[in-house]
Amino acid sequence: MKKIKLEKPTSGSQLVLQTLKELGVEIIFGYPGGAMLPLYDAIHNFEGIQHILARHEQGATHEAEGYAKSSGKVGVVVVTSGPGATNAVTGIADAYLDSVPLLVFTGQVGPLSIGKDAFQEADTVGITAPITKYNYQIRETADIPRIVTEAYYLARTGRPGPVEIDLPKDVSTLEVTEINDPSLNLPHYHESEKATDEQLQELLTELSVSKKPVIIAGGGINYSGSVDIFRAFVEKYQIPVVSTLLGLGTLPISHELQLGMAGMHGSYAANMALVEADYIINLGSRFDDRVVSNPAKVAKNAVVAHIDIDAAELGKIVKTDIPILSDLKAALSRLLQLNKVRTDFNDWIKTVTKNKEKAPFTYEPQNHDIRPQETIKLIGEYTQGDAIIVTDVGQHQMWVAQYYPYKNARQLITSGGMGTMGFGIPAAIGAKLAQPNKNVIVFVGDGGFQMTNQELALLNGYGIAIKVVLINNHSLGMVRQWQESFYEERRSQSVFDVEPNFQLLAEAYGIKHVKLDNPKTLADDLKIITEDEPMLIEVLISKSEHVLPMIPAGLHSDEMIGLHFTDENEEVDNA
């Protein structure tokens, strides 16, 4: 391998930072420890990269996720060996399922101690292998620039994902006078494939004979930077669209062809479109079970086309008639260039529009309890649907998906595939650092809040003005809902008998606390959401709230419960 001489002796830790800076990294999220002391010593006087000191390694990884999801850049994490690395595993797994580009540096004991059960040693490479796109253990200091450059490239290209670098302490300490050539040399790695004209023409030909097509808009549209092209394609052919959770914002909720989120807690119009369609075009979605519910019953009478950058996703869940392995942006760009095929979906559009009107998301205002749906709807109005919205996981996540009026790309930052409680607050911190001029609002339940609330310490420490909307029902709401619906109301360990005083907790972190419990003054009280300072807005809601409508596990998209039809003569299941 070609060697490159350095101007002066340089430590492994300095090489890490210099390489990251050359790659354009501006922020690192981390937490120090023994095996990473050499790197943190180098960080002390290093200029050009800001280090954000998390309060827990899980917090650091979620902060990096929020930063990456909001900006499209690679999120960088630095944690120590052993418990530092294992604490980061949840965030790494979350990033893996949601295709988030992360570069995670984990400390490791010295090379001579590896495999000998040394203090704070863990087989981090083995632990993270199933939940990373690739991982490395650096054994030679001169190899640091090459591996860091390669890992960064792998994290952000193809299907994005987390890449882990295990960095033994001795390797980061040693000084070298020359390095291995860091130029990329990955002859067997294909960044992405591009669809052929023949494949795309087949997709369009099927569209020309279709009468009831629908597009599933997935997170891949966001990740590939394809939102504008996607919208142009939808407009050109006038195809109704259903969104996955991670696909919200790819087409504005207000658009006449947007049917809303599909799946377990999706809209009636979206789910019925999947049932009635004769042609399903999946763009950048995994056919996740939370979207299609019962894969065996999906598209029984429909032709399925699926464009995805990952060959493993094509045909994995749902039988696919037109599988297209391709970078989505390239495929959509070419679809717009090809000669337009003749289509007529007017009758179909009338049908899906009627379904939107027939059973919209709705709720009954109450005089004694605040409705969470109304809280979210009002915040949507006050922010004009333009805020960066972050959620934790649970009932509030689904209400926010249903009721916030999304209109922008990368607007919703949430944990999709893994459904990680504790994601919300740190992810919002990362999103605000990526988009400092945006109003960043995080919705969190009282369960998820108590998992990572220590990250609130960063708000005043770094001047991060996020708004935390705590939807407090004194329970693990989604768990309780399932117990009440499917386990004969046995609320086993899902109700909090004792909770902290959230006002005192907010004051301990030096942030404003507002408690809202009066539905009559809610509209005025929530105007505080537009203020530019960190705050905790605690909204008290009833323990009896359920997220509806819902497709019970294993049932089909047309077997929803809890629907409310505008026509009183329609059959309603309020189970």
Swiss-Prot record:
Gene designation per UniProt: ilvB
Domain of life assignment: Bacteria
Note from the entry: Contains 1 molecule of FAD per monomer. The role of this cofactor is not clear considering that the reaction does not involve redox chemistry.
GO biological process: isoleucine biosynthetic process; L-valine biosynthetic process
Keywords, in A-Z order: Amino-acid biosynthesis, Branched-chain amino acid biosynthesis, FAD, Flavoprotein, Magnesium, Metal-binding, Thiamine pyrophosphate, Transferase
Full protein name: Acetolactate synthase large subunit
Positions that bind FAD: 159, 265-286, 308-327
Catalytic activity: 2 pyruvate + H(+) = (2S)-2-acetolactate + CO2
Residues that, per the record, bind Mg(2+): D446, N473
Cofactor descriptive note: Binds 1 Mg(2+) ion per subunit. Binds 1 thiamine pyrophosphate per subunit.
GO molecular function list: acetolactate synthase activity; flavin adenine dinucleotide binding; magnesium ion binding; thiamine pyrophosphate binding
Major enzyme class: transferase
InterPro entries, A to Z: Acetolactate_synth_lsu, AHAS_TPP, DHS-like_NAD/FAD-binding_dom, THDP-binding, Thiamin_PyroP_enz_cen_dom, Thiamin_PyroP_enz_TPP-bd_dom, TPP-bd_CS, TPP_enz
SUPFAM superfamilies according to UniProt: DHS-like NAD/FAD-binding domain, Thiamin diphosphate-binding fold (THDP-binding)
Annotated Gene3D superfamilies: 3.40.50.970, TPP-binding domain
Subunit organization: Dimer of large and small chains.
Family: Belongs to the TPP enzyme family.
Transmembrane parts of this sequence: none
